[in-house]
């Protein structure tokens, strides 16, 4: 008997809380299909604060081994965190970490939700977090997710107290408890309510757990086990899923065997966690060998895009496509088109910027309405690379023009030249546009006429920027915003995301450029070396100060490379990511002994350090940081040359900082070191390890845990003045 299948297509909207639609569809393996047919009805919602907080091993075991329906609710998108992959911070980092969550869910089989809370950086108190999050809004989002997903059980990753170690972590548990209690109240009035709330505890918080047994509100679960349908164990899958959090450096050796997990009942009635026993499914595969995709001619949707839906029948049976039409997509399908085995059918489904954007749904059944199958497709742009092979990326709604600059922040002494790049997308006809700038605290010359040639997507130009002769008294910073004549909306900047474990895409952010107009003195003739870390703006910041920067390869570093340099700056987290520093250490130390200045930016005190030996004078890193960016600084050595030359630093240099003062301060150091600053978050003891410096032979070594990498990008004048003093130290008569 031959089965025939019909399709119905229409647009749908994705909820802001739910998971994304699929970029394309192909029939699962028979083993995966039967795995998905298991009739276990347990639904579990796992809640934590950030991308990477979730226990992917436990989620994978529940989802893929036990057959439970699992979802993860991340209250933030992690935009306030660190990035070991590259220079992206803020909104761009949030997109990277959001996509890493989706990549993890594609492996562990869970659904992904978001809570819409802002990741404003590390927080030491739950009170600060709840205030900045607007706890009622986040609580409402948690309740909305719970009502949509309808879990039997809610599981938090963190305890609802200070043991969680981060205000965001604590707040995620506190709000989960409040949401559970409110829903329980609704349940008593006849509404839906989850049955129990557990905390996924571990020996990290309770050292005596290793010998614990189930009972007294504690459940001890043994997880792990081979899944024949997938050819992997649940721990393997969970490890691979965790490895998708590459921006946080969470890939590692694949876990196998068994693992013990602990669940502490916080609210509600105990749940029976006995693993279910399954009976092998004998249900027939609905449509084996079905493939469908929706592809467009470009990844950028400005006005409209030609696009097509393609259906490929690789099964042994015919399928049928029912006529459908959607006004937003322009999809036209002839009625009752039969698609024979081995055949491909394609029809236009164009995209329009003024239409309703969402996923295209293919509802698949046979002619008798059996074997129902719903496929939700999102449009993609497909290309290829001779090394990487097929490359797919999402189609994005895109403005016609965007602006970019050579620098993340412009330092204007008296005047400066700024290189500007005007990009355009969509159709590329020959055209002329008028570009102009509005400056706050700076003066920009006349408007720029830009003439694009047919097919030209970017125009490069330079503009003159200078301080106004009569500026605002005391103004040391400003901004520059670009417009096109006839358009009152400022141009945005597109940040390209190009990491192969997540879809390539652009992140559209505010296109205004921070400007620093403060008086910054920099000695002439400074020549500085830079060794890469995890990605920061130090080279650009130094060039803005008029410093000549030489890029150095740590793995092949020689004394000849260092000849003539007064300082060498290591990028942020260099000792966490740059293996070449192991070989470079003896060379750098010899150079310091003979008069060089080694400047080490912040590194994390983790096991991934390439070496514990971070300089010629010993010091150790701790986990101290100051997170309240308004915290006043106490100058411990106000007359030290690094505090006075060539710029006399003052409290004003710590005004306007963003997110934090510094992180991963030194916790122990040789007596040769001089700590330059002292400060503390409210209620804490003062910390002195943020900025320490010591002589070594005829040279100097400095560890600077200040968050300069954030402040340079934000246009904080004091961060540039501090940088100038760091670089100029060896010209102040303290070395060769």
Task: Label each PLM-derived region with a short phrase.
Residues 573-655:
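A glycine-rich, often tryptophan-bearing local segment used as a flexible ligand/cofactor-contacting loop or short
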Residues 273-301, 381-411:
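Low-complexity, acidic Ser/Thr/Pro/Gly-rich terminal tails and inter-domain linkers that flank the onset
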Residues 489-571, 604, 710, 728-736:
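Aromatic-Pro/Gly-enriched surface loop or interdomain linker
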Residues 20-148, 170, 174-181:
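Active-site rim/loop-helix segments in enzyme catalytic domains that contact anionic ligands
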């Amino acid at each position: 008997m031959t089965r025939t299948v019909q399709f119905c297509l229409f647009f749908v909207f994705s909820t802001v809380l739910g998971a994304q639609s699929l970029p394309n569809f192909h029939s699962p393996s028979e083993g995966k299909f039967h795995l998905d047919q298991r009739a276990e009805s347990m639904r579990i919602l796992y809640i934590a604060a950030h991308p990477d907080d979730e226990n992917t091993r436990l989620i994978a075991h529940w989802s893929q081994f036990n057959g439970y329906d699992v979802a993860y609710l991340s209250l933030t998108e992690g935009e306030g965190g660190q990035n070991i992959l590259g220079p992206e911070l803020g909104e761009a980092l949030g997109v990277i970490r959001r996509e890493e969550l989706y990549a993890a869910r594609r492996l562990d089989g869970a659904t992904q939700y978001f809570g819409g809370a802002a990741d404003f950086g590390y927080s030491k108190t739950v009170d600060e977090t709840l205030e900045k999050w607007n706890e009622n809004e986040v609580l409402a989002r948690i309740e909305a997710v719970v009502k949509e997903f309808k879990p039997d059980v809610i599981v938090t990753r963190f305890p609802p107290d200070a043991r969680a170690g981060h205000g965001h972590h604590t707040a995620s548990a506190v709000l989960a408890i409040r949401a559970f209690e409110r829903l329980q109240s609704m349940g008593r009035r006849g509404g839906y309510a989850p049955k129990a709330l557990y905390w996924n505890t571990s020996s990290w918080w309770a050292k005596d757990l290793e010998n614990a047994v189930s009972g007294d509100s504690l459940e001890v679960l043994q997880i792990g086990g081979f899944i024949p349908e997938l050819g992997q164990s649940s721990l393997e899958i969970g490890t691979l899923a965790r490895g998708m959090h590459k921006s946080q450096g969470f890939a590692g050796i694949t876990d196998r065997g068994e693992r013990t997990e602990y669940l502490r009942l916080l609210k509600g009635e105990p749940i029976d966690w006995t693993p279910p026993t399954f009976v092998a499914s004998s249900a027939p595969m609905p449509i084996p060998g079905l493939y469908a995709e929706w592809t467009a001619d470009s990844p950028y949707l400005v006005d409209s895009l030609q696009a097509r839906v393609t259906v490929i029948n690789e099964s042994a049976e015919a399928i049928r496509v029912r006529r459908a039409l959607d006004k937003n997509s322009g999809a036209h399908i002839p009625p009752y088109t039969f698609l024979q085995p081995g055949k491909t059918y394609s029809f236009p489904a164009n995209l329009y910027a003024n239409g309703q954007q969402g996923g295209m749904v293919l509802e698949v059944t046979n002619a008798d309405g059996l074997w129902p199958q719903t496929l939700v497709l999102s449009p993609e742009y497909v290309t290829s690379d001779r090394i990487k092979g097929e490359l797919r990326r999402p189609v994005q709604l895109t403005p016609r023009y965007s602006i970019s600059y050579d620098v993340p922040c412009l330092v204007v002494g008296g005047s400066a030249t700024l290189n500007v790049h005007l990009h355009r997308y969509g159709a590329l006809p020959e055209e002329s546009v008028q570009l102009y700038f509005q400056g706050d605290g700076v003066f920009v010359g006349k408007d720029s006429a830009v003439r694009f040639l047919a097919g030209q997507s970017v125009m490069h130009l330079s503009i003159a920027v200078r301080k106004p002769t009569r500026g605002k008294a005391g103004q040391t910073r400003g901004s520059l915003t670009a417009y096109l004549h006839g358009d009152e909306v400022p141009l945005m900047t597109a940040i390209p995301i190009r990491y192969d474990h997540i879809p390539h895409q652009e992140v559209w952010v505010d296109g205004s450029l921070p400007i620093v107009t403060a008086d910054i003195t920099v000695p002439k003739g400074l020549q500085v070396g830079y060794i890469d870390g995890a990605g920061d703006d130090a080279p650009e910041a130094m060039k803005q100060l008029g410093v000549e920067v030489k890029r150095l390869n740590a793995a092949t570093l020689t004394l000849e490379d260092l000849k003539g340099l007064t300082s060498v700056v290591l990028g942020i987290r260099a000792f966490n990511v740059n293996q070449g520093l192991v070989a470079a250490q003896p060379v750098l130390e010899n150079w310091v002994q003979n008069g060089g200045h080694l400047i080490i930016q912040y590194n994390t005190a983790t096991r991934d350090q390439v070496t514990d030996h971070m300089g010629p004078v010993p010091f150790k890193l701790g986990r101290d940081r100051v997170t309240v960016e308004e915290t006043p600084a106490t100058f411990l050595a106000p007359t030290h040359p690094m505090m006075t030359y060539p710029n006399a630093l003052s409290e004003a240099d710590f005004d306007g900082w963003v997110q934090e003062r510094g992180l991963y301060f030194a916790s122990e150091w040789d007596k040769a070191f001089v700590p330059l600053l002292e400060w503390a978050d409210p209620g804490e003891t003062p910390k002195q390890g943020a900025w320490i410096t010591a002589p070594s032979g005829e040279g100097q070594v400095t560890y600077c845990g200040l968050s300069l990498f954030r402040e340079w990008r934000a246009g904080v004048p004091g961060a540039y003045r501090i940088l100038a003093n760091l670089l100029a130290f060896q010209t102040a008569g303290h070395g060769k």
